[in-house]
Structure formats: C-alpha cells, structure tokens
Regions:
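Glycine-rich, Lys/Arg-enriched anion-binding loops that position phosphate/diphosphate groups
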Residues: 142-241
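N-terminal catalytic cores of NTP/NDP-binding nucleotidyl/phosphoryl-transfer enzymes
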Residues: 8-72
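A short acidic, often aromatic-flanked loop/helix-cap motif at beta-alpha or helix-coil junctions
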Residues: 9-13, 95-98, 155-160
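Residue-level signal for inorganic ion chemistry
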Residues: 27, 80, 119, 179, ...
Length: 312
C-alpha cells in the first residue's frame, strides 16, 4: 500500500476508486465500504485508495478530546492494507485545511489533485468548512469533474446503525461484548509503561502504569485483560484497573495492569492491552485491607472472564 501524506499523488494512482472518511476504529460499517469499493475497483480494472485525515477533525477542533480515538493510526493502516487498499492519501487536518470550503475541497483536492473515477462515501458523509458539504453536493459536481459517486448505506446491527460514536458509548458503559462485535475484533490500546507510586506492589500485586495517549477511555473499573509485551507474540493473561485510586485520594485517571506470572520491571516497554471482560466498577474502600480482599476476588473473576475468545 502506497502512502501519500498530502493530496499530491503519483499519476498512476489517478483515475482510481477512492473511499473518503475518518474511519476511526475501522468497524464493520467501514469494512462494508472497503469491500464494495474494492469490488467495483476490480470490476473496472482500476486501483482502490482511501482518503482520510490526521488528526481526527474532532480532535483538532476540540483540544479537550485528547482521549477520543478507537484505534491507533498504525492499526488503521494495517486494516486498510488487509482489505486490499492500493494507496492511502493521509491529509494533515490543520487550521488551513479546516477553512477550505466544501466546493473548493471538491475542485482543488478531489478533482485537481486526486482525480478519481469513483468515490465511495457513507450516506451521512459531511465535509468542508463547517461541515457544509454532503453527498448531494458531491453528487452534483460529479458530471463536471468526471467522477461517479456511490453512496454506501450504513451497516446495521439489530436495526441500529453502526458508528464510531456508538462504539465509544459501548466502551464508556462497559459493554465490551457489543463493542468488540461491532469492531469485529477485540478492542485494545497500546501504551508505554511509566514509573508509578508502587502502590500495587505494597498491596501484593506488582502493576504496570500505562501512559494512555489519544485513546478513548472505557468505563472506569476492573477488567480481565490479555497483554502483549513489545513486539513479542506471546500473550499473557492479566487484570487491569482504570481509575483514579479513590481509596488513596487520587484524582487523575490512568491504567494499571497486573500481568499474571510476570515479576520483572517493564519500565518504558510498550504494552498492548486487550480488554476482554468488564468485572466491576471502581470503588472507594475504607482501608487497604478491604481493598486487598476485593482485589483477590477480582483476580478470581478475571481468570473466569479470560475464557472469552479473543478475536484479532
């Protein structure tokens, strides 16, 4: 898959089929778009590409939305490649780009620089300054700029439209089973281990404190997890805690994981944490003894929850 970090692409990629969108999470709805676009591209003997944006527009406009993404950029690109994407146009979403009107986006970016023959978007696609552009506007200019627009109806689960926003809500309410079903894989985050206050060790559980950057924060509480350390293939079982340590007066939310059978220090190591099962909500305990007692029970429940099948 050829990657272009601007809309200026090689001549051989012009006249292709492209899908446009943010594609955060690359869920089943997005996958439907890719499958149909690839099918049309093959039928017409042209290449298939994706036009997307970095960072996500909502993260650019709302600086407080730092914890928002469902998937890392690296994962998105790997999934694009899996679905047979020939090239990727990854446009930097900045102040200048955000001011481009919908009509100028069609003329100056799509027509003059990418020059596609087929464009695939979901029927609720919005674009351009203040999101004034929609599928009707895109279709209106198709004849003038020599492209055909194909709208993809949203993929539905039990009558409800699948969306990245809906999956975020699933994670924030602890509904991991539904989130994973809509993603068609087990949701995970990547993060680096940083030094903490070593409270876990004092409570009898050596833990890794993970720095979470940009990812959506799931519901605070205890989780059954699986962990991959660095680039190794081996997967470890464990228990994860997302919260602020209310028993000790904490306020900042962070992720702490206890990897079963691992006692060595993992500072600065990258961990991939798969969220398998939500066990319970966060809770403030009267003292450390009561917390330890509950932690022992949590480990038992986590081991039961880890019997759930992992989907990569």
């Amino acid at each position: 898959m050829k990657i272009f970090n601007s809309p200026i692409i090689s001549k051989k990629y012009k006249g292709s089929a492209i899908a446009i969108g943010n594609f955060d999470g690359v869920h089943k709805g997005h996958q439907k778009v890719f499958k149909q676009a690839k099918k049309f591209a093959k039928k017409n003997k042209i290449r298939f590409g994706i036009l997307t944006f970095t960072p996500l527009p909502v993260m650019f406009f709302n600086k407080k939305a730092s914890n928002y993404r469902l998937a890392s950029e690296d994962l998105k690109f790997k999934i694009f490649k899996k679905y047979g994407v020939d090239f990727l146009v990854n446009i930097k979403f900045n102040k200048t780009f955000s001011k481009i009107s919908a009509i100028k986006f069609i003329k100056n970016i799509i027509y003059k620089k990418i020059s596609p023959k087929l464009i695939f978007v979901s029927n609720n696609f919005k674009f351009g300054n203040k999101r004034k552009g929609n599928v009707n506007l895109l279709k209106k200019f198709g004849k003038k700029y020599d492209y055909k627009l194909l709208k993809i109806n949203p993929f539905r689960n039990q009558g409800k439209m699948i969306s990245s926003t809906g999956i975020r809500k699933c994670l924030q309410t602890g509904n991991l089973d539904l989130a994973n079903k809509l993603l068609s894989r087990t949701w995970f985050i990547d993060g680096y281990v940083k030094k903490g206050k070593k409270l876990g060790r004092k409570l009898g559980y050596r833990t890794c404190n993970i720095y979470i950057k940009n990812y959506i924060l799931p519901k605070v509480g205890i989780y059954a997890i699986k962990v991959v350390i660095g680039n190794k293939r081996k997967m470890y079982n464990g228990i994860g805690y997302l919260g602020s340590r209310p028993t000790f007066g904490g306020k900042e939310i962070f992720l702490e994981v206890n990897i079963f059978g691992i006692q060595k220090k993992l500072y600065k190591k990258r961990l991939r944490v798969y969220f398998i099962k939500f066990i319970r909500m966060d809770k403030k305990f009267k003292n450390s003894a009561k917390l330890i007692n509950q932690m022992n029970k949590d480990v038992i429940f986590a081991k039961k929850g880890l019997k759930t099948k992992l989907v990569l």
